[in-house]
Amino acid sequence: FNGTDGDVRVFTHEIGHAFQGFSSSDDRLLDCVWPSYDAAEIHSMSLEFLTYPQMDKFFGHEADAFRWNHLAGALAFLPYGVAGDHFQHLVYDNPKATPAERHEMWRSMEAKYMPDLDWGDIGYAAKGGRWQFQGHYFGMPFYYIDYTLAQTCAMQFWLACEEDQAAALERYVALCKLG
């Protein structure tokens, strides 16, 4: 933790994983205690949204700004996540691609999915090197799309919470108990 609003995001995200693990720990089917990778991020990303009502306690009069920035970031993440998945398919379909060709593949993904992105004077990123920042592509190939799918599920919990917070929390707890 470093004293920024990111601490709250990371904390609520990781607590979502922990709460899910605790909630399903009594399940006799070991495969149901921990969800598959494609489902695991739903619990954590959803809790980020479901804790919006408590953000006043962290941020006081800046809570609305936090919520807006978090939501904007979540929305902006969707095309980035899709671009990353598409890029990985291109890389694996072209295993002999040179570094320059991989950079060009990434630039084409940025142009397709994030057409307003402008790296300005950040040369390496502008030349297509930004994909190398994402460690998931190296350590857990094809996992990043799971974050994207989970984000859409989490946004559904946010919308449900906007309508009826108690009902949304009940649905969330029920989901966590399923593993």
Language model: regions and residue ranges:
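Short pre-active-site segment immediately N-terminal to the catalytic Zn-binding motif
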Residues: 1-12
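Catalytic Zn2+-binding segment of zinc metalloproteases
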Residues: 16-30, 50
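C-terminal, non-catalytic "cap/extension" segments appended to globular domains
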Residues: 11, 19, 46, 57, ...
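Acidic/His metal-coordination segments adjacent to aromatic residues that form catalytic metal sites
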Residues: 1, 24-35, 61-68, 129-137
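Post-HExxH zinc-binding segment in Zn-dependent metallohydrolases
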Residues: 24, 34-62, 70-71, 76, ...
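Single, functionally critical "micro-switch" positions that shape active/binding sites
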Residues: 12, 16, 40
